[in-house]
């Protein structure tokens, strides 16, 4: 049975569990507290989160013929970098995080399947540092699928760089 996230939060909001858990972690690490920094309810962003472009396919299994859209599934997240900007390693993780948050930020648990997402990065030049990072650190394979289209293979979410 799928759970409605709003109902679940409302039902459990009477008891504030996070402060107790935070305190118990501080006690648990008491002997090594000088090596650690503890932050409760750390805010992840100072700016509002926004996906540059979201394309939702009306019919999930209908293939897209255009070369830059062949990778598309139901929910397609696109990050655009202007000609005077570059696609960095941190941009990759930011957009990947947005994809995960987009999947999460709905009322019904798992309504958007992880296998229904894609991520596309559109940038002016070839992002060498990012590609090197993806290949060496993430162990992804990068393959060319047309003029200026590179698939990033090895993740559950299909990713490509244009």
Describe each PLM feature range.
Residues 1-162:
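Conserved single-residue anchors adjacent to enzymatic active/cofactor-binding motifs
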